């Protein structure tokens, strides 16, 4: 079962539909309606932290989920979920170099893991004004995709299957978005 933690975002059910293409066992729970103990009892195979408004400190249980489950379950964070991973592991989240709401950017990626079989560069959909800051990226994380101006668009834990995507793979404006989701489902 994939647990999709909803950060009160309008894109959550787009993600649900994309994941539903590859698995029929998905449970959606709001970020303030579940505890670590309840997640342990559910015993999900994977955890997804959805996009959402505001900042990581406002994302309910998400940062606690990263800290508790990072060495136990594959975790994918998208947009706010990505920022939660960065901050939970010691990074800094602050204003992005530019505000991107409903805009497309070209990114370069490393072609491994979640990007396996996907050409580089690709165009992705961005809806954010905050970003994980490159200069404060914890040593346990590596950048696996970025924009031409160096903004982090994807990062991965060096030891555990914890991946953050600043962009929205579930948006029609993201090239190969379904393949990115499929790679997470099948690779991690």
Language-model features: locations:
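Acyltransferase
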Residues: 171-188
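Cysteine-nucleophile active-site neighborhood
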Residues: 44-117, 181-183
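Short hydrophobic/Thr-rich beta-strand motif most characteristic of the beta2 strand and flanking loop
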Residues: 25-31
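Structural signature of beta-strand start/N-cap positions in the alpha/beta core
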Residues: 1, 24-25, 45, 74-76, ...
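Catalytic beta-strand/loop cores that center a nucleophilic Ser/Cys/Thr
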Residues: 113-160
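Short amphipathic alpha-helix with an adjacent loop that forms part of the alpha/beta core around
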Residues: 35-43
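N-terminal beta1-alpha1 ligand-phosphate binding loop
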Residues: 2-19, 31
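Histidine-centered divalent metal-coordination motifs
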Residues: 79, 128, 168
